Curated annotation (Swiss-Prot):
GO cellular component terms given for this protein: cytoplasm
Residue ranges of domain GST C-terminal in the record: 90-208
A molecular-function term among this protein's GO annotations: glutathione transferase activity
Domain GST N-terminal residue range list: 2-88
Chief localization: cytoplasm
Subunit structure: Homodimer.
Protein name in UniProt: Glutathione S-transferase 2
Residues reported to bind substrate: Y116
Record organism: Gallus gallus (Chicken)
Pfam families with a match to the protein in the record: GST_C (PF00043), GST_N (PF02798)
Keyword tags: Cytoplasm, Lipid metabolism, Transferase
Cellular compartment(s): Cytoplasm
Amino acid sequence: MVVTLGYWDIRGLAHAIRLLLEYTETPYQERRYKAGPAPDFDPSDWTNEKEKLGLDFPNLPYLIDGDVKLTQSNAILRYIARKHNMCGETEVEKQRVDVLENHLMDLRMAFARLCYSPDFEKLKPAYLEQLPGKLRQLSRFLGSRSWFVGDKLTFVDFLAYDVLDQQRMFVPDCPELQGNLSQFLQRFEALEKISAYMRSGRFMKAPIFWYTALWNNKKE
């Protein structure tokens, strides 16, 4: 059965989901909702449908898989991952998954708040000042492992790739994105299914954010 992923026509919160669908070879189709032109960016392409899909909490992204209808990006990731035993196996692995999942969301939201803020240029120096420390924490958490939980991929690696790739785009010369974090990014991009997806016309690297953001709000 083909699942349907619904989201705006941007990278955003759907990026890790798309990567996981591709990696697991899950048959899927996308409903990419488009905003109207500036300055209003009319969202009616989505709002006209949102109450008609049978979602408990109508929002984007959503995933429809037969009778299963989910919103919340991490709930969607976990649903896909459970089908493929990618949520950690031991209790310690599951703990690492849970901690990193929530920590990465904190990092993602802090970056989004910066990029959507009208004071972007004023706030950017403080963000850049604290970023190296955050990346060093992730580097220590990864350690010498191949993946963030151990030797086997879990869904948090897809989240981590997305978050780290955004920072790499934002600060290309960041020293803290070298070493094991750089190796992690390269290792992830070298995965056969991921590499093929990134070379395909389906892949969307940008825009990361909605059109009102002050950074990375346009297609490349």
